[in-house]
Amino acid sequence: MVWQSIIWVKRNAMAMLTDITKKDKNPVQRMTTGFLPAKITIPLCQEDGFECTSSVKPGDSVREGQVIADVSRDEYGSKSFGAAKIHSPIPGTVTEIKSCTYPNGKQGKAVEIFLNGSFTYLGKQQTVFDWKNYSPAMLLRTISEGGVINTFSNSSYSSFEIEMNKIKDEKDKKLVIRLFDEDPSCQADSILTRSEFEKIATGIYISAKILDANEIIIAYAKNAKLPAAVGIETKELFGSIPVTFIEIDTRFYPCGGKRELIK
């Protein structure tokens, strides 16, 4: 009886979530109000087993988005595969480098920052990044500075820069993009696809340029309409790189993993 009740609750919660996302075409625009604490603690380990090295010290002033911890390297000078640079989410002053308990229960180092000063990005109009005039090497360096990681794998996250470096010299590269939810209980991918497709498309092109991909394959849910639904021409987005859009029947689970997409 208890197990049946849990299933009933989960199904109803899923139904409510689906209903909300269908009624509001772009719910992301509503999520604009946030709480800013006076002091924050940022762990130097963002992925289990990979602790970054702090590049700031107590008393330092930091800007919003400034790198405060860099990727640790092994004895041979190679970067840790799962690590990426850590940035300050707020402007302020570093009060101390201290030990803290991570969300996984382990102890480790962290940077404590007291909120102070003006924001660089929050609430400000962003400048357009002139990425089309960047070389693949410059784009990869920018990605490294941005601390971009790949969250596709459920088991662990990895540095996008290091993953790109591992495969960019291979031949006959096809870039496969999934624009639907791998897990139907988490609708983040589909929500972002509807609300931020132009930005996603730009990211796809940047990735293809870095990899020198000879084809882009975009997998999307069968009931979705892309790219016509967002009023964008494929040639405008991806230039001379051939693009193939493939419908995926998302009624069956799993359908969005690496193996399923390749099949």
Model-derived features: positions:
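N-terminal, Lys/Arg-enriched amphipathic/low-complexity engagement segments
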Residues: 1-55, 70-73
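Generic structural motif
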Residues: 41-42, 46-50, 62-65, 74-96
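Acidic, glycine-anchored pre-beta loop/turn
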Residues: 56-62, 101-102
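Hydrophobic alpha-helical positions that pack around
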Residues: 153, 214-263
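Histidine-anchored nucleotide/phosphate-binding helix
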Residues: 194-210
